[in-house]
């Protein structure tokens, strides 16, 4: 088929559809943030000291599509795609396209526009990319064997925003929304040579991005694009990411071809029911569906395998229908699994996974196969509710056990308590007798999440979006998950659902990250609500069905910061009760059984986190987070690096954060250059991020059940709200978080100097010892105290004693050491302190440079020794190219930004997919490199 003739036939059709896709504003909209009504004045835009270096367009090459096998009967259509603007469809001006990928991804890959992550390059990319239609196309061949199959289908796992799908000159149908799959039958149209074309339509309300600068202020946090949810609403621009010029439209997920003998599987979920508190067996219920695309009823045999467990079931599937299939232990006793390996979140056990292998046998042929990964885990939630006969009732809600009651809670019937905290009511017709009442141990009214009967002290962070240009490949995302696991995090919040993808959930499963999963709406009363609730519900339903088998997902939440509209609240809660019997629908990311979110700014006195903020479950708390100088140099041109420039502001250094920047000069002395600023600010980053987590540690199970950073992960090169930088580099914020979140931990509360041991593991600690020692900057001991024979039960906190710091002068270090009965050090936690009458840490600058020596202990372990007579401060490690000194990323180190006393040794571990030399640097340490 000739593509030129094909597109000529579609010219008038494309115009009509584009016109029909227009939407009018909702007349009853109460929210106010429509974003900018027009582009901001030129004089308020950020300016760079150097012009943008525009790339050269890469010459197009002929590339034929090759179908990449994914399973026995599934192929991925990746290579050979082309893309062009809709008004150039009749020309030769096509690009080799990146699929999966967005429109902008292709244009950057092909050298049309510069890398938007660098400097102010994003401003040089035209805004009208999100106001144009685009076409994708590819050609592929099918073998006689594939053409002989009874059924051939195309699966689109994610487009944005809308798409028409054309195959061999015929329109197959349309897809609307960024998170719904499209499934199209091509059985009667497929030939030896095939042409596939996709017409991409942008959202009707793309909005106008606000460009951050010192003159324009911080981002406006969205705008008109929120009307078009389900989509990536943050791509209009937020205060942590600029507007993405194409709004992430395109074929952003993979396209697959599936061949069967006419009977195929739908989405599958394995429901695991444990006899809690016992976990010695699990009842497995398999929920799936079978679809018969043939014109006659078919008797099939469903065969299943889970490890050593096998089962079969004969099923009749009526012609042209899709039927639900439920397999349970009552009918198949082998689905009662003995001694299962449980899926547990990071720090509480291993995230064990099983594969359910299903085959559908039709006669002597296998029609379809499917592999579903699942974990044996059961969720429950402690929270406070109102019942008709009792207010403030503390209950444990197990969605699986309570499913027969219908929807347990009515989130439209809320009691407002002090501080804006809301208590939900039991649904109409339910009372105390219907629920599991538990004692109030001081945690009322706050939410507690339990996995397999174990309370989980939730610590982690928000992902505003996985990647600004939606590179959601496993290769790109997995290092971030390794960093989260090694930071001892156990929860990621999928903020406004912007990180929804198969790879995201797969990696959460594998690395033990609980997922708080939002849908695609933001702040109630500020951000706009979606115009098309039917479209929203179709996407939401598909997400719940598609990803419901992932054990990591712990809650569904309708929006960020607020409740859904009354109609969406009713529809979402009913849908989730029907489609997912294992999880809680949580109606609000704050307020309902939660504390108010925030703060998001730097605290001059980190003790305020303890005295004011630390209570309940907080879904967002954050502080600025400037990365290392090495990462900054990859982020912007040298001329914009110092002094702080417009480019810093464009990369999220917001107005109102002056105190964070000023704190560097105030506490550590005026920064002389970029390197000086970045090495000094890491003290602030470490202390701030450690304090946020340690403040919640101080009230674990007394008044606190969880805290999530805003944010743990950056969507692009940023100087704000992150624990690591986009390039996988770790710095003070990361290691401060990692220290505070270690499963066995000793800390000194900054508000009252109480010394506390935290044990978030499932095993008790016995005969432990805690030593507190104060040192001056030369490493001279000033005071000491030790406590022995300490027992700390599993999953608990123990307050020990108050550190006696009165009378200490100048700058000094408080060192806490937790060791076991044999004297083995479990953890060390150091605090740099200001004594009476001391306002800063400028004395650090007068400490003589320390010398350190490294030696290799094993393939992955290195010993570092302080061979000088004073403390070596803020030691940081990197893997580097021994010839050039260039930092190699990712590389994972067991510790960083710690201090060594004179003569002290410390062993670190490193692992990386690359090889190189180990380099150590420090605040008062000259760089030292150990070649491997």
Spell out what each predicted region is.
Residues 1-11, 20-467, 471-491, 700-704, ...:
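Secreted/periplasmic carbohydrate-active enzymes, especially glycoside hydrolases
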Residues 14-15, 630, 914:
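Alpha-helical transmembrane segments and their juxtamembrane interfaces
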Residues 345-348, 679, 683:
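Short, conserved micro-motifs enriched in small and acidic residues
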Residues 427, 434-435, 439, 491-655, ...:
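Substrate-binding/catalytic cleft of secreted carbohydrate-active enzymes
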Residues 668-679:
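Short glycine/proline- and acidic residue-enriched helix-loop micro-motifs
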């Amino acid at each position: 088929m000739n593509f030129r003739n094909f597109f000529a036939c579609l010219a008038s059709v494309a115009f009509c559809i584009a016109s029909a896709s227009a939407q009018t504003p909702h007349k009853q909209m109460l929210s106010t943030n429509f974003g900018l009504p027009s582009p901001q004045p030129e004089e308020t835009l950020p300016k760079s000291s150097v012009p943008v270096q525009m790339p050269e367009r890469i010459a197009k090459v002929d590339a034929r599509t090759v179908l990449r096998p994914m399973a026995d009967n599934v192929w991925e259509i990746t290579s050979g795609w082309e893309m062009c603007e809709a008004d150039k469809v009749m020309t030769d001006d096509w690009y080799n396209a990146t699929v999966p990928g967005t429109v902008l991804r292709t244009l950057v890959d092909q050298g049309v526009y510069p890398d938007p992550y660098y400097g102010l390059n994003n401003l040089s990319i035209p805004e009208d990319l999100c106001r144009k239609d685009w076409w994708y196309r590819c050609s592929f061949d099918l073998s006689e064997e594939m053409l002989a199959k009874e059924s051939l289908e195309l699966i689109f796992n994610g487009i944005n925003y809308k798409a028409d799908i054309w195959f061999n000159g015929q329109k197959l149908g349309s897809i609307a929304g960024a998170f719904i799959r499209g499934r199209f039958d091509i059985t009667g149209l497929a030939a030896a040579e095939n042409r596939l074309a996709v017409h991409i339509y942008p959202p009707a309300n793309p909005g106008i991005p606000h460009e951050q600068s010192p003159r324009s202020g911080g981002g406006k946090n969205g705008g008109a694009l929120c009307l078009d949810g389900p989509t990536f609403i943050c791509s209009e621009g937020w205060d942590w990411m600029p507007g993405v010029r194409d709004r992430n439209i395109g074929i952003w997920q993979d396209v697959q071809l599936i061949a069967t003998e006419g009977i195929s599987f739908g989405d599958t979920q394995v429901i695991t029911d444990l006899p809690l508190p016992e976990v010695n067996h699990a009842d497995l219920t398999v929920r799936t569906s079978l679809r018969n695309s043939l014109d006659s009823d078919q008797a099939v045999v469903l065969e299943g395998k889970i490890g050593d467990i096998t089962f079969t079931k004969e099923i009749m599937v009526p012609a042209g229908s899709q039927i639900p299939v439920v397999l349970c232990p009552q009918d198949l006793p082998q689905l009662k699994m003995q001694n299962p390996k449980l899926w547990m979140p990071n720090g509480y056990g291993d995230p064990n996974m099983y594969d359910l292998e299903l085959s559908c046998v039709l006669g002597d042929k296998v029609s379809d196969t499917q592999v579903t990964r699942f974990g044996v885990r059961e969720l429950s939630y402690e929270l406070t509710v109102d019942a008709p006969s009792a207010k403030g009732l503390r209950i444990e809600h197990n969605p699986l056990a309570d499913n027969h009651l219908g929807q347990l809670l009515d989130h439209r019937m809320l009691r407002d308590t002090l501080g804006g905290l809301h208590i939900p009511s039991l649904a109409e017709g339910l009372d105390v007798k219907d629920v599991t009442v538990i004692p109030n141990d001081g945690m009322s009214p706050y939410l507690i999440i339990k996995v397999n009967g174990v309370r989980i002290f939730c610590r982690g962070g928000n992902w505003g979006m996985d990647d600004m240009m939606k590179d959601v490949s496993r290769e790109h995302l997995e290092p971030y998950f390794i960093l989260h696991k090694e930071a001892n995090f156990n929860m990621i919040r999928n903020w406004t659902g912007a990180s929804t993808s198969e790879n995201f959930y797969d990696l959460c499963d594998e690395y033990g990250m609980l997922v708080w999963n939002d849908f695609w709406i933001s702040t109630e009363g500020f951000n706009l609500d979606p115009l098309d609730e039917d479209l929203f519900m179709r996407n939401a339903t598909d997400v719940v069905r598609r990803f419901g088998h992932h054990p990591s997902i712990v809650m569904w939440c309708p929006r960020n910061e607020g409740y859904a509209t009354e109609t969406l609240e009713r529809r979402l809660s009913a849908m989730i009760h029907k489609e997912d019997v294992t999880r809680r629908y949580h109606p609000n990311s704050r307020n309902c059984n939660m504390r108010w979110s925030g703060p998001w700014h730097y605290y001059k006195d980190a003790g305020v986190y303890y005295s004011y903020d630390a209570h309940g479950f907080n879904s967002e708390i954050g502080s600025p987070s400037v990365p290392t100088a090495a990462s900054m140099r990859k982020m912007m041109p040298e001329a914009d690096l110092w002094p702080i420039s417009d480019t810093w502001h464009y990369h999220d250094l917001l107005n109102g954060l002056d105190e964070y920047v000023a704190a560097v000069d105030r506490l550590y002395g005026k920064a002389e250059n970029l390197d000086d600023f970045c090495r000094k600010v890491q003290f602030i980053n470490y202390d701030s991020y450690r304090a946020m987590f340690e403040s919640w540690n101080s009230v674990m199970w007394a008044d606190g059940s969880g805290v999530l950073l805003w944010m743990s992960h950056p969507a692009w090169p940023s100087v704000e709200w992150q624990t690591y930088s986009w390039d996988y580099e770790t710095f003070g914020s990361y290691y401060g978080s990692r220290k505070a979140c270690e499963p066995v931990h000793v800390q000194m509360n900054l508000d009252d100097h109480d010394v506390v041991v935290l044990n978030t593991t499932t095993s008790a600690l016995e005969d432990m010892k805690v030593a507190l020692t104060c040192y001056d900057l030369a490493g001279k001991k000033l005071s000491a105290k030790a406590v022995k024979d300490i027992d700390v039960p599993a999953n608990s906190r123990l307050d020990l004693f108050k550190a006696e710091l009165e009378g200490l002068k100048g700058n000094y270090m408080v060192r806490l050491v937790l060791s076991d009965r044999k004297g083995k050090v479990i953890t060390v936690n150091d605090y740099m302190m200001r004594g009476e009458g001391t306002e800063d840490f400028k004395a650090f600058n007068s400490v003589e440079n320390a010398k350190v020596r490294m030696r290799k202990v094993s393939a992955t372990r290195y010993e570092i020794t302080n061979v000088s007579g004073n403390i070596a401060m803020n030691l940081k490690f990197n893997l580097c190219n021994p010839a050039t000194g260039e930092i190699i990323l990712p590389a994972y180190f067991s510790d960083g930004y710690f201090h060594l006393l004179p003569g002290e040794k410390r062993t670190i571990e490193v692992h990386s997919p690359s090889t190189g030399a180990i380099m150590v640097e420090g605040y008062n340490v000259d760089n030292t490199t150990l070649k491997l």
